[in-house]
Structure formats: C-alpha cells, structure tokens
C-alpha cells in the first residue's frame, strides 16, 4: 500500500522522536569561558564520549545537545537541498555512495528523489558539488577545514576526491570523534588533525568552514586568519551572524573586505536569515552575488 505524504511525515517524526535522547547532566563538560558557540553546551562532552565509547558512538548524532550544534537539517530543508543539486545540473543519486546515515543514528526523513536519508549528508554532498562548480576538481589539493563536526564533510571529500591532504582543525574532543568516524568509513590515510594551539602558518590550496569560523570570538578568528585564511589560495566559508555581542565576531562583510579577491554569495538553500557564502580564488560561479 502506498502511503500518502502526510502519513510519511508523521512516521518520520515519530521515528526521529524515538531516536532523540538527552545527555545526563552528571556527564557535562560545558565550558565556563567559551571561545565558540560549540563550547556553550554539552557538544564537547558528547564528542568525547562518542569517540571513546561504542554505546555513545552508535547514537551520538541523535543526542539533543549534539543536534543543537550540528544535526539540525530537517526534511523540508532536505528537499530544498535536492533542488539545489538540480539547479547545478546534477542528480542527487550520484552522491548516494558518499552517505553514511547508518553511523551515529541521525534523524532521517523520506526526501523526494533522495530516499530515506539524513539531510545532513545531503548538505555535505551539496557543498562538494558547489566546491567543484567554482573550483573544479579537488584532486591534489591540500585542504584545511575549520570546525569539523564529526568529520562528515571531510569524509565525503576524502571519499570523492584524490586530495593531497585534508587537515581537520578543531578542539581535542571533536578531533577524537573525527578520527573514530574516519576509521569507521576507512578514510584516515590522508587526514591530518590540528588543534588551535598547534596550528602552523603555511600555504593551503583551499580552506573551508561550514559556519564554524563565523561562530568564533574575534581573538580566535584573528589567529585563524593569520595562520590559515590569509595563507589559502582558495576559500569557501559559509557564514552566519549568531554569536553574542561579547564575542565581537567579524561580520561576513568585514571578513570578505580583508580578502581582496573574495566575493559574497547567497547561501542556497538559506538555512538561517542572514547566512552567506564567502569565496575567493574561484573561477566558476554559483549564481547571484
């Protein structure tokens, strides 16, 4: 029997609600002096637990504290992402082999033309398509990613391109989870792991950041700018404006003004009001600036 659209939505909602769980307060490692939004809640705690304990690794993506930071793409946004693939001339099914929605028990939805999928996986694939649209092939690139989640974006890039190296830049706890995730999907060979304290100034072919750079305080942004951003031939930075005033975070316009060849594009699909994409070193275009 073919289920109607409304019933499928209800079933997805119930399944996802069943997956959702909360981290016990006794396990919290939340920082009292955060330098980024990801340090405000229990995000670092669940990263650490998932990197060390099979029980938590199997379900970390459905933890409420983790979803508040990373796993927040819903079914409606999933369909908008599929439409974005088509606007760029690709069928979303070409990227299905890159998805690992079976790891970490993420929320999943029935998305037209994509199937039963984690929309977060769709977003990572859409970003790969955008990268290849404006920069061409990523083969032989040395890539650095600022703020790496569980390694989902980097994992898909490593699986789809023959890069020279892929540097994951983040705090110790997320990096521990990334190592475990990449081991699970067999993509550790070209991965490099760097904490902010160990960051070295040096040339990169491409730097990317999905929101994370824009969620840092200004002091940390300046460090990243000096050591990574200014040293990168190309850049792809998705930017939001949600940090509290005390962070004194650069706006996207200020950030772009410090990179002579940069351009600002609309984020497509728009995940939050005011979000934009800042790029430089590109030869292709994604549409309207």
Q: Which ranges hold each PLM region?
A:
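A short, conserved alpha-helix within the catalytic core of class I
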Residues: 216-228
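Conserved SAM-binding loop of SAM-dependent methyltransferases across substrates and taxa
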Residues: 150-162
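Conserved class I S-adenosyl-L-methionine
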Residues: 139-149
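Conserved beta-strand signature within the Rossmann-like core of class I S-adenosyl-L-methionine
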Residues: 232-243
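A short SAM/SAH-binding and catalytic strip from SAM-dependent methyltransferases
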Residues: 205-219
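Conserved alpha-helix/loop element of class I SAM-dependent methyltransferases that forms part
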Residues: 121-139
